[in-house]
Curated annotation (Swiss-Prot):
Organism whose genome encodes this protein: Aethionema cordifolium (Lebanon stonecress)
GO CC term (a single one): large ribosomal subunit
NCBIfam families from the UniProt entry: rplV_bact
Main location: plastid
CDD domains named in the record: Ribosomal_L22
Record InterPro entries: Ribosomal_uL22, Ribosomal_uL22_bac/chlpt-type, Ribosomal_uL22_bac/org-type, Ribosomal_uL22_CS, Ribosomal_uL22_sf
Protein name in the entry: Large ribosomal subunit protein uL22c
SUPFAM superfamilies, per database record: Ribosomal protein L22
PROSITE patterns cross-referenced by the UniProt entry: RIBOSOMAL_L22
Amino acid sequence: MIKKKKKKSYTSVYALGQYISMSTHKARRVIDQIRGRSYEEALMILELMPYRGCYPIFKLVYSAAANASHNKGFKETNLVISKAEVNQGNTVKKLKPRARGRSYPIKRPTCHITIVLEDRSFDQQYDEYLMYLKNPGYRNAKINLPCYETYSSGGLWDKK
């Protein structure tokens, strides 16, 4: 099996929660609501949703933001949840004692949750820089536009 090398990302950070005792279906129901949203908006949504799976996901999103601000110095206002995935973990099997010496099996599903946050401020700066490289008069065009309109309309010049 050939493994791909992961590129080092300078604009994203992640938090990984493993063996969270919750069904993957129930966790995905919550994760689908916050995928692609900003960090602050996701926290508000997670606080107000009535599901039991919201609290572990809330802690993971908060931890990923703490990683972003501490390790890479990102501002929390620019963070966006770029990737959020839920994978199935091990199933913990227990025996519940019942009447007359019998026992019933109990299955506790677990899941692994990955939250990836991305800093959007770098993308905006990069896009502006590319526009500047493609068109050197990019910023000056915005400034000189009103003057050009006044001259082209014939307001100031009295041409014959």
